[in-house]
Amino acid sequence: MKKLIFLSLMAICFCVRLYAQTNFKYKNASLPVEVRVQDLLSRMTLEEKIAQMRHIHAYSIMENGKLNEEKLEKMIGGQNYGFIEGITLPGKECLTLMNEVQKYMREKTRLGIPVFTLTESLHGSVHDGSTIFPQAIALGSTFNPILAYEMTSAIAKELSAQGITQSLTPVIDVCRDLRWGRVEECFGEDPFLVSRMGVSQVRGYLDNQVSPMIKHFGAHGTPQGGLNLASVSCGQRELLSIYLKTFETVVKEAKPWAVMSSYNSWNNEPNSSSHYLMTELLRDRWDFQGYVYSDWGAIGMLNYFHKTAQNSAEAAIQALTAGLDAEASDNSYAELQQLVENGMLDVKYIDQAVARILTAKFNMGLFEYPLPMEKNYDKVVHAPAHVSLARKIAEESIVLLQNENNILPLQMNKLKSIAVIGPNADQVQFGDYTWSRDNKDGVTLLEALKERVGNQLTLNYAKGCDLVTDDRSGFKEAVDVAKKSDVCIVVVGSASASLARDYSNATCGEGFDLSDLTLTGVQEDLVEAIHATGKPVIVVLLSGKPFAMSWIKENIPGIVVQWYPGEQGG
């Protein structure tokens, strides 16, 4: 009897405790976000708070393509980590993993705080099978903010179907050194254009329940020498009116919940430890209410690259006290607990950072977020409407630079043959931050022309040369092809890597800066050789950045810039 009474009392206590936990204020969606944040923050241990400021790489908790719960438990030690990324995962694998991790965080940790599942989606989700839209520089060339909104609305739907709640885009840098490899990621060199496109893209994400992260804050688009990690040198007036004007506009008008700090510096002061940028400007002057996230490894760079910190602990102090709330792909914030316990860091900075992260999670509905179902995946990812939108953007992004004697459009009924020549004539170029570089995942210009002309006329193709080598052995074939054709289309340009997959022969994109702006390899020599045949020539620039083509401008009657046009580019 006593045993029965004891068990009954234990059951009652458990039920009372469970009822109390499920009725915590932070779990009540009807309460103001501020109340929910403060209630949850008051219940968190120091370890739990710091975990919210850190992230997990998917590959570190997976085995044979699936979640290894033992690895996850060992890594997080029962704490709710704030973020997880799975950038290189195939789409359905990403959905499965993100759902499993999200469910684990909600159901098997003490407070059940959901995780921000994040990925890249600069011009489409980077997970296999997603729609590949035109690169940002192409979208900017449409001068159409409506298309910018429609594009991120479509991307957000695909991300949600893949279990993603936080996108590491859009890029709203103002690019003014065209040697920089990341020009392709930007909308352009005008702050007004970049601002309008940025506002539209942020709204497209937010209206479709995905949190965007504007980047790279701040002054990242004009590094010295065009080198990706180099400092940006400019006065405060130029900084505010050019490079940061886009961030001010987007923060005030579109109200994103996340900003990524860049890993470079302004006038040799690292952005990752700039109190002026992240606190005085972003929060005090512009009233930003969300959190600041570091670029990949940027906090550690304060130690080994910028040399402002002697070790990772100093780097953590510099970044956090300046206003950098969350750390990506580094372990500097693992030092925070010991720094607090040793009296070297006031815990108020941690509370402040965690409150901002939780504010974003509550506002984005993560605590009430239903896990996406796999049955919806194929209906959403690479949907026909998204593919059609990608084509529409590609069409509007084309720029006609030169059209002497109205050589364009071609009078197809007057032609018997067309020569299609060049290293990019039969090769897709999607741009950086994509999941593929393979022709099977897009339409090349040559393929599209074959479909367009059918049996109406003859297409003669020759590659001519590569993008980067000095090999001219293909010139003879290209010249022969040109001689037997009525008109020649020569497709030159650049190539970019696909994110974390294939970096071969890249001449553009992150980490692939150029020392000058002439076409790489012997591409211009190829154009000259084709021009020497006396046949009419049209040059198509299929690239992620502008190039200096003085000879081509002076001698070729038709010049078209296509940029990186996405999967429907042909």
Give short role names for the model-derived ranges.
Residues 1-23:
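Bacterial Sec-dependent N-terminal signal peptides
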Residues 17-570:
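Glycoside hydrolase catalytic-domain context in secreted enzymes
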